[in-house]
Amino acid sequence: MLIVLSPAKTLDYDTPAHTEISSKPDFIKQSAELIKILRQSSPAQIASLMRISDPLASLNANRFAAWSPKFTQKNSKQAMLAFNGDVYEGLDAASMDAKQLAYAQSHIRILSGLYGVLRPLDLMQPYRLEMGTRLANAAGKDLYAFWGNTVTETLNQRIAEQQSEALVNLASEEYFKVVKPALLKAPVITPVFQDWKNGQYKIISFYAKRARGLMARYAATKGIKRPEELKSFDVDGYEFDAAASNEKTWMFRRKVGI
């Protein structure tokens, strides 16, 4: 079983990593190509391109300027420990033990606008580049064109290596759009998390994002190898709803926490 996650906008490079184990990203050459393009933009242009504030644009212009094709413990941090958004609050990688980290490294992949695909322990230099950014490049008008089939082929390689029964999609629509399900060598299962509010079940963004991280952590904690085992996920009051699910979309619902 292979799980894919989205990255996070917020990063934590201040907290020391609790493990020295790391790997290098597979697509440093491609990342360098994107960095070269991004360095041509002023902070004002970055603010417009990414629809972010001027201070954030300046921060990221400095990040792009400092980016190096050489990844070290000084300029980088393991991706799963550097990301710090809602998903990663649920994942809580900083409290994972060696066995759980090893599971994550084997069974989880993080989709990234700059790095394409990251293993959880791949060293990552700080950046902000969302997959939906319309950054023109030699391959086309945006990052989906830039990455082409690369991400799908990389996932297929891992699927073949571990003889995965399915790809579990815990990423957002924006990020999973870089994956081409028709070319994948395993079916895609997408867990959906809903909360009861105002008389109906609905997706509440913060809770749904956090639940994706919780499910990835659940898989690592239990050492899950088969997707069917995820139906037992019961963290924070969520339960699998068979009646509302189908082969491709698995519904997990709860009536508490709101």
Curated annotation (Swiss-Prot):
Record GO biological process: response to hydroperoxide
Among Pfam families, the record links this protein to: H2O2_YaaD (PF03883)
Q: Name one GO cellular component term.
A: cytosol
Q: Which residues form a coiled coil?
A: none
Q: Which NCBIfam families match?
A: PRK02101.1-1 (NF002541), PRK02101.1-3 (NF002542)
Q: Say which family it is in.
A: Belongs to the UPF0246 family.
HAMAP family this protein is in? Answer: UPF0246 (MF_00652)
Question: Per its record, how is this protein called by name?
Answer: UPF0246 protein mma_1385
